[in-house]
Amino acid sequence: MRPKRLGRCCAGSRLGPGDPAALTCAPSPSASPAPEPSAQPQARGTGQRVGSRATSGSQFLSEARTGARPASEAGAKAGARRPSAFSAIQGDVRSMPDNSDAPWTRFVFQGPFGSRATGRGTGKAAGIWKTPAAYVGRRPGVSGPERAAFIRELEEALCPNLPPPVKKITQEDVKVMLYLLEELLPPVWESVTYGMVLQRERDLNTAARIGQSLVKQNSVLMEENSKLEALLGSAKEEILYLRHQVNLRDELLQLYSDSDEEDEDEEEEEEEKEAEEEQEEEEAEEDLQCAHPCDAPKLISQEALLHQHHCPQLEALQEKLRLLEEENHQLREEASQLDTLEDEEQMLILECVEQFSEASQQMAELSEVLVLRLENYERQQQEVARLQAQVLKLQQRCRMYGAETEKLQKQLASEKEIQMQLQEESVWVGSQLQDLREKYMDCGGMLIEMQEEVKTLRQQPPVSTGSATHYPYSVPLETLPGFQETLAEELRTSLRRMISDPVYFMERNYEMPRGDTSSLRYDFRYSEDREQVRGFEAEEGLMLAADIMRGEDFTPAEEFVPQEELGAAKKVPAEEGVMEEAELVSEETEGWEEVELELDEATRMNVVTSALEASGLGPSHLDMNYVLQQLANWQDAHYRRQLRWKMLQKGECPHGALPAASRTSCRSSCR
């Protein structure tokens, strides 16, 4: 090692000419069992420094195994111990003696850059590596793996209280999100109307785009995070290696400084001894010259002889001295080279520290950016949750609207069917109405013809035959004995059914089956055409009834009743005839009062049709012969009823005044 070589050189320079130990090397000060008193305090100081360095190295290793929080605490402790270490270094530098190596040691401990390089050789390197930002300045342009390697440790040291990382979005979450978005589009397009579907589709597209952008950003952040973690691991490994190298170099510098101090002390002691020996020799020579002034040439000659006698040993010593001087010169050159190398190493260390400081600043900036991105990520997570809730609400609304639209479509279809039925019915009713109008006009013409024919028949003399055929369309009443009964019964039943059941009226008048008219009682209110048809039919019925019920337009029935029947009726016993006639009159009056009441109710309900339509099987089954026969029978019955009523009032109706056919018809009509 370098201290041993320096010790050997100094020992060779202190040997005397006749010393037998000249060929041996002087022992090093650290190997001596009893050091000098002046060197003991310094040895204690160096031992303390070495112990502090060892403890700091062990502390660094233990902190490297633990987390970032103990490292930060150790950094704070190191920062707290910094002033005392610096003052101790300055005291050591001031207490050193003024020799040739003192400026070099001062350069080693203090350096050419002021207080930034302090702490070398005193165990402060670990503190510098723990907290580099407190010891260095700034240097721009640093990049590469060194910049990214120190990020994670600085993040742990600068931000120990960061919140735990948010749960990462995995590929399964992305698939679920895309599946939900794919499920939303078809029901929305099928269920909602066109405008709402477009609006919701735009909303869903925006939500899908937002989700995809969030997924992309999350994947990019995950990749960056993995890269930063890899760089941080490499940076930690490099930091551990550099710390180990720095500790080794710190120990070497400490040993070198201690050996230099010991060599300087030994050289000073040897110089003092040589000066004392030279003074003693000079004093001895002076004493000899003073005591024997005449013997001086002899002594000189003796000394010359002695020098001549010891010449080979002297030459060997001189050669050895020359070799030692050359070796010392080489060692000096090596020392200067080592100094330059140490200066370069010091500059490199300072550059590394500056790079680490810049990396720490960049890490702080990156940590701020990371915090902002985490906040943005949390906001995006909240936005995604809110959008998911909105999507669920929209799904529920879409389902509700779909059910409502289905109901409305069903109602619309039913309404369309009803509307089509009503349109068909209105068309059919219009055609029926037109037919009825034509038939009514025909019946009116025929009625006028019949009235004219009846007038002509009235003007003709009565015929003695018993037939009632005064016109070509009439039928004798004797040939139809039960016609009046059936006619009255049919009139009553038809009127009652028309009043009670309008469906029966429609079946009888418009030839509709029972299944087709089941829904008519509910559809009357929706058709204005039907109301108009009803009103028109009621007016026609009233007009027909008025035309039929006019007494002056009808032909009296006396002309059609033969005299033989009137004469035969007088043969009935008087008492029985009177009782029967009274009963018949009372029953018939009651029956016609009921019929008139029913007719009044029917007119109020706008359901009564013409008497011609009600008397038969409907307008489709009417025949002209049948209608004329009904009119004749109606006139005959009415005239007979009037005649009988007049005869009862006058008391002129004897026993058997009415024929048997008329009595049976009256009874059946009353029943």
Swiss-Prot record:
Q: Which residues cross the membrane?
A: none
**Tissue specificity as recorded in UniProt:** Predominantly expressed in brain. Selectively expressed in neurons.
Instruction: Return the annotated region ranges for Disordered.
Output: 1-83, 258-289
Location(s) in or outside the cell: Cytoplasm; Cell projection, Axon; Presynapse; Cytoplasm, Cytoskeleton
User: Which UniProt keywords are listed?
Assistant: Autophagy, Cell projection, Cilium biogenesis/degradation, Coiled coil, Cytoplasm, Cytoplasmic vesicle, Cytoskeleton, Endoplasmic reticulum, Endosome, Exocytosis, Lysosome, Mitochondrion, Nucleus, Protein transport, Synapse, Transport
InterPro entries (alphabetical): HAP1_N, Intracell_Traff-Reg
Additional observations: Was not found in huntingtin-containing aggregates in huntigton disease (HD) tissue.
**Name the UniProt record assigns to this protein:** Huntingtin-associated protein 1
